[in-house]
Regions:
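Short amphipathic
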Residues: 10-18
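Hydrophobic/aromatic beta-strand elements that line small-molecule binding cavities or substrate pockets
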Residues: 16, 72-78, 103-111
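Beta-strand/loop substructures that line and gate deep hydrophobic ligand-binding cavities in soluble
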Residues: 94-138
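Short beta-edge strand/loop motif at the mouth of beta-sheet-based domains
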Residues: 13-14, 32-71
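Short hydrophobic/aromatic-rich beta-strand segments that constitute the beta-sheet cores
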Residues: 54-56, 84-88, 119-121
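Short, conserved beta-turn/loop elements at beta-strand boundaries and strand-helix junctions
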Residues: 80-85, 114
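Short acidic N-proximal helix/loop "leader" segments that mark the beginning
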Residues: 1-11
Length: 139
């Protein structure tokens, strides 16, 4: 008998409202000098054209804890600055998760009233149960 301990989560959607312009949000996501301030200890690099590379690089703290230098790799599927970014996301921090198929992350940036911008992040996790379990903190 086999027991599957991985969750069935296939899509995560996060929506947040930020008092900033769409361009400022775009820059915070896509420019390494900005995203290293807000993300995990490290930086993300994007080649913002369809087929361009995405890389999340571990900072010194993460590497000191045993993480590899290249944490996540992927490909830019669509880039429409400063409105929409679609990318694949393939974590590499352990063998089990690296063996799974890449997932897909969509960043939708929409200007709202009063100088506020709505950021919606959709992470499609189909066919990646280990990734789903880890990113939903259920592993």
């Amino acid at each position: 008998m086999t027991t599957d301990t991985h969750t069935a989560v296939t899509t995560q959607v996060y929506r947040v409202y930020i008092k900033a312009t769409p361009q400022a949000i775009w820059d915070a996501i896509t420019k390494p000098e900005w995203n290293e301030r807000y993300g995990y200890p490290g930086r993300s690099e994007f080649d913002l054209r369809p087929g361009g590379a995405f890389r999340a690089i571990a900072g010194p703290q993460a590497q000191a804890m045993g993480m590899p230098e290249l944490l996540v790799e992927g490909e830019v599927v669509e880039a429409d600055p400063p409105r929409r970014l679609v990318q694949t996301w393939h974590p590499l921090w352990d063998e089990e998760i690296a063996a799974e198929s890449p997932t897909r992350v969509t960043w939708d940036i929409e200007e709202d009233d009063g100088g506020v911008t709505r950021l919606t992040v959709t992470h499609e996790l189909e066919n990646a149960p280990v990734t789903a379990a880890q990113v939903t903190s259920t592993a």
